[in-house]
Regions:
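Short proline/glycine- and acidic-rich turn/helix-capping motifs at secondary-structure junctions
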Residues: 17-21, 63, 134-148
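Short glycine/proline-enriched coil/turn segments at helix->beta-strand junctions
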Residues: 7-9, 17-18, 49-55, 126-131, ...
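Serine-centered coil/turn micro-motif
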Residues: 39, 148-149
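Midchain, well-structured core segments that form catalytic/ion-binding scaffolds
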Residues: 1-111
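Generic structural signal for residues in well-ordered beta-strands
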Residues: 11-13, 22, 131-133, 166-167
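Zn-dependent metallopeptidase/amidohydrolase metal-coordination segment
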Residues: 98, 149-189
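Redox- and metal-dependent alpha/beta enzyme cores, enriched for Fe-S-associated oxidoreductases
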Residues: 115-132
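Short, histidine-centered active-site or binding-site loop motifs used for metal coordination
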Residues: 26-28, 136-139, 189
Length: 189
């Protein structure tokens, strides 16, 4: 209760037999808007870092707390980027730990103009901590110029009908991998 009150993170520890059970409650958010959520995995990592654990797990926890923490923009890693297509978002989406290894899956949505730089920047940050990027699953970024006739037409019609700003977002990457030429646009995006 003290931890929750002082940090705002909903993490509890309880004893069940000879095991300690950590429970963290978060708030789900899409990986393109992680700042709208509360990452339960990250909250547990920050809790564990506060315990002063030794060894390789302790080194990982310290790295995570210092270089990532509760941020969702890559700023502690020196990777904060933004362009006309949007800003970089960074979210830890999965973690698997056993006696021999720790695997973590990070979802990084990066601005169009920084696509080649992001993987190199992240690799450079994790290497000194003894970590290796085992797999990089990078999708090609996707962009339509704002002055493209289709974009101008869609924006004009949308604004006329709704009275709302129609500036396209940088979401929709999943759709763009499947449907060439799709534009993240309108109230759904």
């Amino acid at each position: 209760e003290e931890y929750r009150r002082t940090t705002g993170r909903d993490v509890t520890a309880s004893l069940e037999g000879n095991r300690i059970l950590l429970t963290s409650r978060g708030l789900c958010a899409h990986s393109c808007t992680p700042f709208n959520g509360k990452n339960a995995i990250v909250a547990i990592l920050m809790f564990l870092d506060g315990l002063g654990i030794d060894g390789s797990m302790g080194a990982f926890l310290r790295f995570f707390a210092e270089k990532i923490g509760m941020t969702t923009d890559g700023s502690l890693l020196g990777m904060k980027r933004e362009d006309e297509c949007g800003r970089l978002t960074f979210s830890l989406s999965k973690m698997d730990v056993d006696e021999d290894r720790l695997e973590w899956v990070v979802n990084i949505r990066y601005p169009y103009t920084y696509k080649d730089q992001v993987t190199a920047d992240f690799t450079a940050q994790v290497a000194p901590a003894g970590m290796v990027m085992d797999k990089v699953d990078a999708h090609n970024t996707y962009r339509f110029p704002m002055d493209h006739p289709m974009i101008r037409t869609l924006r004009g019609v949308y604004e006329e009908l709704t009275g709302k700003d129609s500036t396209p977002g940088h979401e929709g990457g999943t759709y763009a991998q499947v449907v060439p030429g799709i534009v993240p646009f309108g109230s759904i995006f």
